[in-house]
Regions:
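Conserved core segment of the aminotransferase class I/II
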Residues: 219, 223-294, 298-307, 383-389
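Active-site phosphate-binding strand-loop segment of PLP-dependent enzymes
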Residues: 142-209
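PLP-dependent enzyme catalytic core of the Aspartate aminotransferase-like
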Residues: 155, 338-347, 352-391
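A short helix->loop->beta-strand "cap" motif at the edges of active sites that frequently abuts
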Residues: 114, 135, 192-195, 223-224
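Conserved PLP-binding catalytic core of the aspartate aminotransferase-like
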Residues: 293-294, 307-343
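N-terminal small-domain helix-loop-helix segment of the aminotransferase-like
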Residues: 4-97, 104, 153, 278-281, ...
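Conserved PLP-anchoring active-site segment centered on the Schiff-base-forming lysine
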Residues: 108-130
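A short helix-loop-beta submotif of the ANL/AMP-binding
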Residues: 132-138
Length: 391
């Protein structure tokens, strides 16, 4: 490469593990239980609303912070589910996906030398985004088997330089839903250190059994210290639309909007109208989807257990965490690559969800697929790990 080097944060990044494993799955004709996207699109009525808007127009730049219909629908959603009121004119920003919402929020709050806390295992975008902004990233490392937040963990990560903590609940990849005690502990540290919380709530409605997603922003004194991120793709099985949003107090959202205008500036008006329709008319789909996913979770837990994996509890998201230590001594990545090539089932190794020294033997399976797909994956795994199966 001629000339001077590029940004060292991105120069040292490999292709994301999700792209790598999906490409490997395609190459070997494997069932892809790695990347977390449904294999069936969301409701036709939502897609028709977007198609109608595309045909009828206008198809020019919409307002930078989002069309009024969608901003109002988002504010109504948060008021209904969390009893937190936001002004749609000044406290909502629509983004091109939740990952852009994360980037905008980090850009709005972080300056060079600030400290940012992430909870590991963590979505793999957090660390490089923050480091590219000049942040010093501290990690709170949750430990199996329960992956719970504790006061000593947070005390070891927070300092007087802490500017923000990224909070993902339900937590990808382990499926934890932080309970009220854990969230109150988080809130206490955020307040004590006068920090902010960027709440990655994209799996907010995918919560199982008797667990409840509690929005951190709804806790006492947290409204002024939180930015809350949502995702239409996760709610309505429309991940390719890449429509997300940020809600929060006006002073913080104004900074998010300033960052957003220099990133994507805006998002397709037709897709925004489709999502506005969905939030106002199709939330029953989202709630019924969660019931379907719970049945699929239970099916895959049984299938993985029969194949010889240890399986951790899953309280939310559409991912299962499996322990392969009784099946192999290989690294998680080598094992996942072999599983894809030889068993015909792709999964995601856990190590990319940690900055360094992730736990050995853990892998992530997505169960947001059709039952026929999950059944075939179960058959392949059971056959491959059968004691009489050839190796």
């Amino acid at each position: 490469m001629g000339g001077r080097e590029g940004n060292p944060v991105f120069a040292r990044q490999d292709t994301t593990i999700f792209t790598v494993m999906s490409s490997l799955a395609t190459k070997h004709g494997a069932i892809n239980l790695g990347q977390g996207y449904p294999d069936k699109d969301g409701p036709l009525a939502i897609r028709e609303a977007a198609a109608r808007a595309l045909r009828e127009g206008p198809n020019q730049y919409p307002p930078m912070t989002g069309i009024p219909e969608l901003r109002t629908a988002i504010a109504n959603h948060d008021a209904h589910f969390y009893r937190v009121e936001f002004d749609p004119k000044s406290e909502v920003v629509v983004t091109s996906g939740a990952t852009e919402a994360l980037a905008d929020s980090f850009m709005a709050l972080i300056g060079p030398g600030d400290e940012a806390v992430i909870i590991e295992p963590a979505y793999d975008s957090y660390r490089p985004m923050l480091e590219a902004l000049g942040a010093c990233v501290k990690s709170v490392r949750l430990e199996p088997p329960d992956f719970r937040l504790t006061e000593p963990m947070l005390a070891g990560a927070f300092s007087n330089k802490t500017k923000l903590i990224a909070v993902n609940s339900p937590l990808n990849p382990v499926g934890r839903v932080f309970d009220r005690n854990e969230l109150e502990l988080l809130a206490a540290f955020v307040s004590r250190y006068r920090a902010y919380a960027v709440c990655d709530d994209v799996y907010e409605h995918i919560v199982f059994d008797d667990y409840e997603h509690i929005a951190l922003i709804s806790l006492p004194n947290m409204r002024e210290r939180c930015l809350r991120i949502g995702s239409a793709g996760k709610m309505f099985s429309l991940t390719g639309w890449k429509v997300g949003w940020v809600t929060g107090p006006e002073p913080l959202v104004r900074l998010v909007a300033n960052a957003h205008q220099f990133n994507t500036f805006t998002t397709s008006p037709a897709l925004q109208l489709g999502v506005a329709y969905a939030l106002e008319n199709e939330m029953n789909f989202t709630l019924s989807l969660t019931r379907e996913l719970q049945a699929k979770r239970d099916f895959l837990i049984e299938a993985l257990t029969r194949a010889g994996f240890g399986v951790f509890p899953c309280e939310g998201t559409y991912f299962l965490t499996a322990d392969s230590s009784k099946l192999t001594e290989e690294s998680d990545r080598i094992f996942c690559e072999r599983l894809t090539r030889e068993a015909g089932v792709a999964a995601i190794p856990f190590s990319p969800f940690y900055g360094q020294d992730g736990p050995s033997g853990l892998i992530r399976f997505a169960f947001c697929k059709g039952m026929d797909v999950l059944n075939e994956a179960a058959n392949r795994l059971e056959k491959y790990f059968s004691p009489v199966a050839p190796r």
